[in-house]
């Protein structure tokens, strides 16, 4: 059975395969990864709310980076880039 491709799988795979402890992407790169046919939504270019690390809004891109184990730490709307940091997993919680 073929695995279903989800909307944000491209960004999840890209960040997992190319990110270290931190990765910076331009809005153009995000366009190409997430929205190759339509581009980022206008709200992503106008407000930092679109970039919130929040699973409760599936229409936004958070699924992509959170599922990859990263969070947005910087959004620069003027220069059109985003910085993601790898989420730290604390082993002491499970000892």
Regions found by a protein language model. Give the residues of each.
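Ser/Thr/Pro-rich, acidic low-complexity intrinsically disordered regulatory segments
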Residues: 1-23, 37-95
């Amino acid at each position: 059975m073929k695995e279903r491709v989800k909307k944000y799988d491209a960004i999840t795979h890209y960040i997992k395969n190319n990110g270290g402890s931190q990765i910076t992407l331009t809005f153009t790169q995000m366009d190409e990864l997430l929205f190759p046919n339509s581009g980022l939504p206008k709200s992503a270019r106008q407000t930092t709310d679109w970039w919130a690390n929040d699973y409760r809004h599936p229409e936004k891109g958070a699924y992509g980076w959170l599922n990859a184990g990263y969070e947005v730490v910087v959004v620069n709307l003027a220069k059109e880039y985003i910085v993601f940091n790898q989420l730290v997993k604390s082993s002491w919680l499970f000892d």
